[in-house]
Each structure stands twice: as C-alpha cells, then as structure tokens.
Amino acid sequence: MRIEEIAKCFNVEVHRAEVGEANVVNLARELRNKNYQVRILGEGSNGGTITNPAAVRDPINTIFALLKLLCLKDEVLPNGKVVLGLFHRWCKFSGNESLYRENFTLDDVTKTLPKYITTGVSEPRAILHIQNSNHSDLKSKYQKNFEKFWQEKKSYLFDQYGISSWQAVCNNGTKQTNGLTDFSVSARGGLKIIFYNGEKNPISFIWMRGSGTESAFRVMCDVKVLDNSEISLTKATEFEKELLEYHSNLIKLSDSI
C-alpha cells in the first residue's frame, strides 16, 4: 500500500503481478503493448528494482538510483528558473515540503515516506509449513474460516481499528483479479485481503502465497500508521502482530480440516 500512496502523489498507476521476476517483466511488456509507459518495475527481493530497458533485477542500478536521489538537488537555470531536485520534488508532491532541507540525508528521505508496519520477509512468523499440497482446496477452506472470523470479529475490528469492509484480490501470473468471490481461484498464486475504513480507504492487508518448491506458505501483514504520534505507531505495531496471528491461525485451521 505504501507504493500506491507514493504513486498517487505523482498521478501514476500501479499494476501488480504474481511473485516472480518473469511475471513482473511480462506484465510490463503487456502494458507497453497497450501503450502504457512503464518506467520502473519491482520484485521485492535481491535489489528489487528493474529499470527499463533492463529486464532483470539489478542491485547496482538500485544503488545508483539512490545516489541520484541524494545528489540531484535544486538547480537555478540561466533564465532564473529553479528546477527542483528529485527529493525536493517528492516533498512538494507528497505534501511534505516543510520537511525538505538542502543538505538532506537518506534518513530525511525515509522520514517523508508513508508510514506502515510490515511483516519482515525473513521473520520466522512470515513462513508457515503446511500439509495440503492442493492450494486451491486450502484456500477454499480458508475462505470459509475467514468469513466466519469476519462475522465474529468485525465489530471488534471496527471499534479498535476502524475497519468496516474488506476485499479479496488474487494475482496469477500477470493477471490480477479484484473483488474475488472464490478464493480457490488464486490457486498457487498470491491471495491478498485488503481491509478498508469507513471512507473506503485501504488501511491494512493480509497476504499469502504457497511456495512452488516446498511445503511452506509465505504470509505477511501490512498496517498503515495513521499519523505521526507515538500512540498511532504503537497501535499499528500491535495490530500488525494481532492480524498476522489471526491470519496464520486461520491457515493452520484450514490445513487441518
């Protein structure tokens, strides 16, 4: 969700594919064939960034992108016009211009990013070991358990965290399906449940995807920090742990049926 917030500041779209470098690159090709201008891709590990015309992740390219962000600062043209540097431009578009300073550091940059609490991919709680090799069947059972959980917990989730609705989304290859009504359709692809507040703004999600090579499910949770107060940070941290635990327990229950 952080990426969507950043993209919105620049009035650009985010398109998502299933996990895997090939899926991301193929989706970009499909979009270009539809006359989209796709400048940057991402696949979440090992340097992540894929910058057109490259078709693979390149950590060195990512490092140089960070250096450009730090080094390209405001420039005054001969005609007196000021061309904003990359970070200054970001601060302006994101409503954080008051946080800009000329001699900024990478720490200053991170402070302007939308704040979320996200499960770390290398954390032990981000991996579950399952027995059911039929992921469609597992997710079908998970759907029944999740819908029961929602009916039991929706009042609590609204009172504590302002959650009023949810939507299931799946990614299979280069295809994304929103408003999923049958979780089993996601098969071995990624399945995400996005939670919304009363204004229909996304404030958290849970996600899972089974490994194609081992009996493991990768899971994660993402929770928006609503403001800069310490209370909001603490509450979001606690909710990420709570929501991921609910999610993991529902998967385990579905695997045991």
What are these regions (language model features)?
Residues 1-222, 226-257:
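Phosphate-binding and adjacent anionic-ligand microenvironments
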